[in-house]
Amino acid sequence: MTLMACVICLGLQAQTSLGVHPKYVVLITIDGLRAEMVDDPLMPSPFLKMMSQEGLRISKVIGVPPAASYPSHTTLVTGEVPARHRVFYNRPFLWNKDTARISYWYADSIAVPTIWQRAHERGLKTASLFWPTSTNSPYIDYNVPEFWSLDYSCDQMEYIKPSCTPLGILDELEQNACGKLDTITYQAGSLQRDGRTAAMANYLMNHYQPRLTTIHLITTDYSQHALGTQSQQLLQDMASADHAVGTIIENLRLTHRLDSTVVIVTGDHGFCDYSQTLSPNVWLTKAGMLSPQPGGEWKACFYAGGNTCFLYLRKGNDRKTLRRVRQMLDSLPNDQRRLFRIVEKEELVEKGADPAVVLALEPIVGVAMTNNRTGEVVEQRRGGTHGFLSGQDATTLIAYGAGISPARQDVIRQTAIAPWILQLLGID
């Protein structure tokens, strides 16, 4: 953890009553949570508004490069940037091979200790539901990971059962907590999903009493990608996510554990609307530096991991190709060049990006990056995106419960959250 992260962590600790170590910590992520989704009076988020008023509220949480689900969720449980924890994107860059739909699913991708590991090694029980990069973690006692088959025609919930811990736990949850899960009752993006996840969490907390529980609520991500940040669908999804959080709070109250629990709600990233897409690999393909399809000859390739395009060279020290790329970027017409800034290696290292990246392109707000290699460089299209380097898509944080006094703080870095959770649990 960096010195700055230590300082910020001390600031978070100051918001907790001195000497208070709650017995339980629950970390909930609402995928794509923005501050406006809590603060806007038109947003149907009464539970989050109540928690924000009565607990600790951090207006802005600045994420890691890129601000995307898998690297960000891994930072939340490690306190480290991608350069250290080694989960760089949602899907790994496979050096001009077809990435298909492979993601950083497995916990052994993480190169540093997690809060699950630290808690488990101290003899504390842990639980997790649908957390990215948690599959096969030996440190999560009760685990239903985010994992899926590349064969979308299969029964996805049956597919993941052998990867759940302990074996049979998902059957137990279906029988006693959430009902049968299938493509209708638990479809990604469905309004039913977050509520059923909350029911599973409540069952695990009631019956097994894990000291640390991590929960990923995903529905709000889908509507924002498809429709942007102002849709009616998002209002419905936000109400669903808020209700899921509310049922967890209610369950803690009814089981007399709210006064011994800290509940932290945050996002992995925020969102920004876009009206144009930009495809930098089209330039490389036209210049003969990249094959039109994955698997061919190449010298350079941009990878849109989130909404920043990271440049990889087939030979990392190929200065000639790097000069060609720079010359290509410098010669672009103004109507294309104005859509992005060049991020140099020094800034990428400082922010903790993949060390193999030689430079990156960060678009202006209103533009979304793609990995397309052919077609138009710029297209008119609308939706929502995230994955900036400069914090335009920051998320927010609320902490509520035992020892948490009403307080406001403007900004923290995402790397400060995991050390604070360990401090709450009394783990040095």
Regions found by a protein language model. Name each.
Residues L18-V38, K49, R57:
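Mature N-terminal segment immediately following signal peptide/propeptide cleavage
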Residues E36-R84, K125-S128:
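Short, structured active-site-proximal loop/turn typified by the sulfatase FGly-forming signature C/S-X-P-X-R
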Residues V26-T29, E36, I58-I62, T75, ...:
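Structural recognition of the beta-strand scaffold that forms the well-ordered cores
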